[in-house]
Structure formats: C-alpha cells, structure tokens
Amino acid sequence: MATPHINAVPGAFAETMLFPGDPLRAKYIAETFLENVEQVTDVRNMLGFTGTYKGKRISVMGSGMGIPSASIYAYELIKEYGVKNLIRVGTCGAISTDVKVRDVIIAMGACTDSKVNRLRFKDHDFAAIADYSLLSAVVDSAKEHGTQIRVGNVFSADLFYTPDPQMFDVMEKMGVLGVEMEAAGLYGVAHELGAKALCVVTVSDHIRTGEKTTSDERQTTFNDMIIMTLDAAITL
C-alpha cells in the first residue's frame, strides 16, 4: 500500500537497499550497476528502483538531504515495505588531517547536533551505531577490493552552513572522521524499528585543507565505493 511519500506497490522493494541522498544518484546506481531494473516510486521525484546485482535482488532509492527527510523515507521503507537492510551511500567532508580526500569512511557511529534521537529516547542520549553484520560485510568487501577505508565516527549535522566553525576543533579532538547529514537519523530509525543500517561515504572535500575532488575523481571514487558496497550487499 502506498504511503504519503512512496507510491510503490507491496513487494516492490528488496530487503536490502542502497540509500543515497540524491535521487538522480539513485537513478545512476540503478542504471549503471543493476540489471532488470524497474522504477518503482517517484513521489516528489524521490526516485526508487529495484533490480538485480549478480543475481540478487537489490533496491536503491534517494533519501533527500538531512535527517528529517532521510528519517521519513527510512521509516516508511522499513515499516510499510519490509526493507531490512538500509545502506546509506554518499559523500562527506573530512575533518582530521590523517583522513584524505577520496578515502572511504564506514560510519561505526554517528554523533549529531540534532535532537531527533533524544525525541525517540525519552530525552536521553542514544548511541547511534551501525549494525555490526552490515559493517563487517562492507569491511570484508573493502579488503577484497583493496579499497582504502577508515572505520569510525561521523558527525551528522543539521546545518550545512554552520554558524560555529570552532565545533570542527571539538570534532577533531574527539576523533570524528567526517561530517555528513543523515547517518544519525538513519541509525535511530533502524534501531527503533528493528532493522539494520550502515553509512558508507567517500570523502569529497577536506574541511581543514580546502582540498576538493574533481568531478571525475568524485565519480571514479563513488563507483568504486558502490561496487564494494554492492558486493557486500549480496552476502547479506
């Protein structure tokens, strides 16, 4: 049955889904890496697709930008469509000087300035962590592909244009590897509903040094990350 934000029919989505922010990136993943692809939802142009990868049924759908948007789609996908494994794939900005542009970060945990998980957890701090089985599968796949990865915490920011750049100093002191905008909310929804979630992001730019990837570098690194993640997804 359709939800307010998804018009797919029951059974349209696979149990495992890649979850990029950009719906056009979802379209690119589906058309580039999947076979037998079908577009299954398009409400608000938030495109979702289902196909197969090496014979296994896989879905991919955009989440939009930020925790509120990602949380809505994750909730409806898990609650109404039975999605069990949600893997966010996207980009982030690096903070630590030992994290390099084009590195892949696997978010073991997600700090945040959002109150969304406190709302879920009676105003207490909730440890927003990834599912270990998903994390382990992607780490193993990265080793097989020879992909340079970092495993640790990210920071899920509510504001893209922060009014407090000194917060980056605190993040670096606490060992945060990168900044993005969705993981903490995704992890909270997954825990609330008994699903599994993981965030895998490539470093597209460095907040400290100002270094940025070119569009070609970004696409190549992104492709490598997607293949690595899809190869992990088919083992679940």
Swiss-Prot record:
Known EC number: 2.4.2.1
GO biological process: purine nucleoside catabolic process
Site (Important for catalytic activity): R218
Active site (UniProt): D205 (proton donor)
Highest taxon of the lineage: Bacteria
Binding residues annotated for a purine D-ribonucleoside, in chain numbering: H5, E180, M181, E182, S204, D205
GO cellular component, one term: cytosol
Enzyme class, spelled out: transferase
Sites where the protein binds phosphate: G21, R25, R44, R88, V89, G90, T91
Keyword annotations: Glycosyltransferase, Transferase
Annotated catalysed reactions: a purine D-ribonucleoside + phosphate = a purine nucleobase + alpha-D-ribose 1-phosphate; a purine 2'-deoxy-D-ribonucleoside + phosphate = a purine nucleobase + 2-deoxy-alpha-D-ribose 1-phosphate
InterPro entries for the chain: DeoD-type, Nucleoside_phosphorylase_CS, Nucleoside_phosphorylase_d, Nucleoside_phosphorylase_sf
Pfam families referenced in this protein's UniProt entry, alphabetically: PNP_UDP_1
GO molecular function, one term: purine-nucleoside phosphorylase activity
Family affiliation: Belongs to the PNP/UDP phosphorylase family.
Function, in words: Catalyzes the reversible phosphorolytic breakdown of the N-glycosidic bond in the beta-(deoxy)ribonucleoside molecules, with the formation of the corresponding free purine bases and pentose-1-phosphate.
Assembly behavior: Homohexamer; trimer of homodimers.
Protein name: Purine nucleoside phosphorylase DeoD-type
Source lineage: Bacteria, Pseudomonadati, Pseudomonadota, Gammaproteobacteria, Alteromonadales
